[in-house]
């Protein structure tokens, strides 16, 4: 039996939110180390099916082991923004009973210094989820203008000292290549602590900047917006969308999307609309039932500090669409 020792955030809450049909078809759009997938499979009968996706080859390699152990499971190497295309090729569009997206960085990506995600571990400055394509963080920092660096730090990291940090990076890269996580972390930390003596020491000074660069390099927010626009086509009537986000930018996108498609336009009384017109207006704007949000318990946060910023939002596709 496949078992992966991994503390998946909001594990039980996410699977409960999917409202598993034992013979249904489900998608884990962010396989990672397989924590959520393993739990979903435990809820399915032999007639059920789970399709996983991940753009990280190391995750796909783990998933391929599971495919040999469980015929109900398959995994695809692709970002979840390509989900509609992949599911179309499998003739399953409109038949999916639930989609789960865990938007957090996998624990193994943070602890593997060679991936370059963490300012706590020295390694090559890469940060790519799929290191077989695209530019690395080092390559981008080496050629990006000061203005572009500032924009990324401010937009994706909400870093108040973005201008000063960008200036420091541009000055330092003229002296030596910023190709290690430790080098970038030191530049950012020195800048933040120099200009802000009252900085909250409980949070590492490089936290926001590393987050911003990672989001930019992997186009993470674009990925989220793309998949959200496709979920209506993918889900079966009554199918569930469950998204776990880990920062305010991600959560804002998910919250806005669900709210936008779970509202009904309120028409003043006595407006002369026929039943058909009302139904058209209603179904054209309301496609989801907003089922709310869930946050980790204090106990889970104590056991897994990564859970402290997690927010789970979920919704159900309306049957009459």
From Swiss-Prot:
- EC number(s): the record gives 2.1.1.199
What does the entry list as the binding residues for S-adenosyl-L-methionine? 34-36, 54, 80, 102, 109
**What reaction(s) does this enzyme catalyze?**
cytidine(1402) in 16S rRNA + S-adenosyl-L-methionine = N(4)-methylcytidine(1402) in 16S rRNA + S-adenosyl-L-homocysteine + H(+)
Renumbered to this chain, the signal peptide range is: none
Keyword Transmembrane helix recorded: no
Offer one example of a GO biological process linked to this entry: rRNA base methylation
Matching SUPFAM superfamilies: Putative methyltransferase TM0872, insert domain, S-adenosyl-L-methionine-dependent methyltransferases
The UniProt keywords, alphabetically, are: Cytoplasm, Methyltransferase, rRNA processing, S-adenosyl-L-methionine, Transferase
GO CC annotations on file: cytoplasm
Membrane-spanning ranges: none
Identify which top EC class this enzyme belongs to.
transferase
Localization, UniProt:
Cytoplasm
What function does this protein fulfil?
Answer: Specifically methylates the N4 position of cytidine in position 1402 (C1402) of 16S rRNA.
Concerning its family, UniProt says:
Belongs to the methyltransferase superfamily. RsmH family.
NCBIfam families found in the cross-reference section: 16S rRNA (cytosine(1402)-N(4))-methyltransferase RsmH (TIGR00006)
Name this protein carries in UniProt? Ribosomal RNA small subunit methyltransferase H
The protein's gene is named rsmH
